[in-house]
């Protein structure tokens, strides 16, 4: 594409035109003949001597072509605009002999219709070229100026509504959100129906939710269903290096929208420009605030009669300016969350359309294996499965490709079978992963073990996949948290039991980070400590739909901090003892599973179930624990969805 950029330059076309004219005059224009030139006096003398056979002339042209008796041709030029006949008569050149036969054949051709114009053009060509160069350079200078002035124009992309490409049929897994947005479609299609009852058309809809849940897709589906134009722009496209550009682009965007009303304006990632004024980590930002003020005026200012609906998407609703999200601007908030199992089935059905599937593919099983996956994750799973099937030269996508794709998306990265591991490393990783699996199988409150492997994938030397219960994604009990802590410590405990304290590796580093985070959250966030009570310690500012804390204000003293550390240590120690007790009771199963992993590298299905059935279950007694609550349940924010968990989250263990 970049190689053809020079074709768009008008200067190139000007050069081509000049070259074409030069070639025309050189080979096709007047005087293009290559015959030899002879003076008119010599021609008259030769004619008097009877050496000339024919003279060709053209009306209005001074040039003549003389043909001699021997066939040679010469060019000559008349001294004036007089005709050839008069010139020959003046010099007494006879055109006929005594017998009346013509001795010199004089041919006078009429002037061509374009000859005069061509002559005029030939004379004016240098002047036209100078004017052309002048206009060209003036336009270049004007273009540079217009480019600078175009900063104030909106960068929104418009999609016509007469040919919708996306409708509600293309969106699955968000039925409640579709119902809310279906009313927006009715507002756009039948505004009189609501106006007759005194209902006011909503000015805006704010869609909030984690990344990949379909906010942009739903907004385009609304435009497709309503059959109206759709303007799409990102919140970061408003503010530029020049002052006032953001407000100018907002005005231009809404001017375009009003000219195409009824229509939809979609602003993606509106938190980039709609952040609360005078707030944030960097303080105030005059240009961004000026842009936000213009958005506020356009959405609910003096001109409120336009049929333009603004749909905005963000995963940071907590930082938006209160004036932006008030009723009258964004009248509705539509929350999109990770789909449940029924939603995932419908999403998978949408994405597998047009793809050849093998007979063993079961979308319901696949949906149950992907709790916490967003719509974008499921789309990626289907695409990765298709890529794997093509790589394996298959004509249909089988369940094996879908299983590999789920692990690839959940853990990150392909299997690294080419990675060379020593026998010692394989042994350590095998016992580590077997420890995770056996502890998980022995605890009733733990997630179900789905697969154990020592094949490296991504940055993990091996991993254990657990299938969380759908009901536990939003609500976690104390027993579930403690079971998860014990499972996470199972790999470290297995290494200690088999190889001793001095031979424990760094393979459990990721597990220890996860254990510490969960235990501290139980004490400081969920109030699951009898010693400290149901109190939240520390005021946290969080990214609500991103699952990361960006700051925490400490609102407790040193003594309370010491007690928190003691409680966290007690919870982790209890989980460590639980994992140790389970593995000591099931040492034979631990050895057999580790040996099977070394031999087969991956255990799943019936082979894994046979080993798990031999594990002796253990029921935790929380009556003596110092970290329970009266009801034993707490709300777990959906900010950190539990995708299939892997036991070994960090780098592979170092050789002992």
From Swiss-Prot:
Task: List ligand-binding residues for Zn(2+).
Answer: 432, 436, 511
UniProt keyword 4Fe-4S present: no
List localization entries: Cell membrane
**Name of the protein in its database record:** ATP-dependent zinc metalloprotease FtsH
User: What is the recorded membrane topology of this protein?
Assistant: Multi-pass membrane protein
Q: Which PROSITE patterns match?
A: AAA
Q: Has the keyword Disulfide bond been applied to this entry?
A: no
What does UniProt list as catalytic?
Answer: 433
Give one GO molecular function term.
Answer: zinc ion binding
């Amino acid at each position: 594409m970049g190689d053809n950029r020079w074709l768009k330059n008008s200067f190139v076309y000007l050069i081509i035109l000049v070259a074409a004219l030069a070639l025309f005059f050189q080979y096709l224009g007047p005087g293009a003949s290559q015959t030899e030139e002879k003076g008119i006096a010599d021609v008259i003398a030769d004619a008097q001597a009877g050496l000339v056979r024919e003279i060709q002339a053209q009306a209005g042209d001074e040039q003549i072509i003389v043909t001699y008796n021997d066939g040679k041709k010469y060019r000559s030029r008349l001294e004036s605009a007089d005709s050839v006949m008069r010139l020959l008569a003046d010099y007494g050149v006879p055109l006929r002999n005594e017998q009346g036969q013509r001795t010199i054949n004089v041919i006078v051709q009429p002037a061509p219709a374009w000859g005069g114009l061509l002559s005029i053009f030939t004379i004016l060509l240098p002047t036209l070229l100078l004017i052309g160069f002048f206009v060209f350079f003036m336009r270049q200078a004007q273009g540079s100026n217009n480019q600078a002035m175009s900063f104030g124009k909106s960068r929104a992309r418009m999609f016509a509504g007469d040919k919708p490409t996306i409708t509600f049929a293309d969106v699955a897994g968000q039925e409640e959100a579709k119902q809310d947005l279906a009313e927006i479609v009715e507002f756009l299609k039948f505004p009189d129906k609501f106006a007759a009852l005194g209902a006011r058309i909503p000015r805006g809809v704010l869609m909030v939710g984690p990344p990949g849940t379909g906010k942009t897709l739903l907004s385009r589906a609304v435009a497709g269903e309503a059959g109206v134009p759709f303007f799409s722009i990102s919140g970061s496209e408003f503010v530029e290096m020049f002052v006032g550009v953001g407000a100018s682009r907002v005005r231009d965007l809404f001017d375009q929208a009003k000219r195409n009303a009824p229509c939809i304006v979609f602003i993606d990632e509106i938190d980039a420009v709609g952040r609360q004024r005078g707030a944030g980590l960097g303080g105030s930002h005059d240009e961004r605030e000026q842009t936000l003020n213009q958005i506020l005026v356009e959405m609910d200012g003096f001109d409120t009669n336009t049929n333009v609906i603004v749909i905005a998407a963000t995963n940071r609703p907590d930082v938006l300016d209160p004036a932006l999200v008030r009723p009258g601007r964004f009248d509705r908030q539509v929350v999109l969350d990770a789909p449940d199992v029924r939603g995932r089935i419908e999403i998978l059905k949408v994405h597998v359309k047009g793809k050849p599937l093998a007979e063993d593919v079961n979308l319901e099983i696949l949906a149950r294996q992907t709790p916490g996956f967003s719509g974008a994750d499921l789309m990626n799973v289907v695409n990765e499965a298709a890529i794997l099937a093509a790589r394996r030269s298959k004509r249909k996508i089988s369940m094996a490709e879908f299983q590999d794709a789920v692990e690839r998306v959940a853990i990150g990265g392909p299997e690294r079978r080419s990675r060379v591991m020593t026998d010692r490393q394989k042994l350590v990783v095998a016992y580590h992963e077997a420890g995770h699996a056996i502890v998980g199988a022995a605890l009733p409150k733990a997630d179900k073990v789905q697969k154990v492997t020592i094949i490296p994938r991504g940055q993990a030397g091996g991993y254990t996949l657990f299938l969380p219960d759908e009901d536990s994604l939003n609500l976690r009990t104390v027993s579930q948290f403690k079971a998860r802590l014990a499972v996470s410590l199972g790999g470290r405990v297995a290494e200690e039991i088999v190889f001793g304290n001095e031979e424990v590796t760094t393979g459990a580093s990721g597990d220890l980070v996860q254990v510490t985070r969960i235990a501290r959250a139980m004490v400081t966030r969920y109030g699951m400590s009898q010693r400290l009570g149901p109190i939240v310690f520390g005021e946290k500012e969080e990214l609500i739909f991103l699952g990361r804390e960006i700051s925490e204000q400490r609102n407790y003293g040193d003594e309370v901090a010491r007690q928190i550390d003691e409680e966290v240590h007690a919870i982790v120690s209890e989980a460590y003892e639980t994992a140790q007790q389970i593995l000591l009771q099931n040492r034979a199963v631990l050895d057999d599973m580790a040996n099977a992993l070394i031999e087969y590298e991956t255990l799943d299905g019936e082979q894994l179930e046979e080993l798990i059935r031999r594990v002796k279950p253990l029921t935790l007694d929380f009556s003596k624990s110092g970290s329970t609550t009266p009801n034993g349940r707490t709300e777990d924010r959906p900010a950190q969805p539990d995708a299939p968990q892997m036991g070994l989250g960090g780098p592979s263990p170092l050789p002992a």
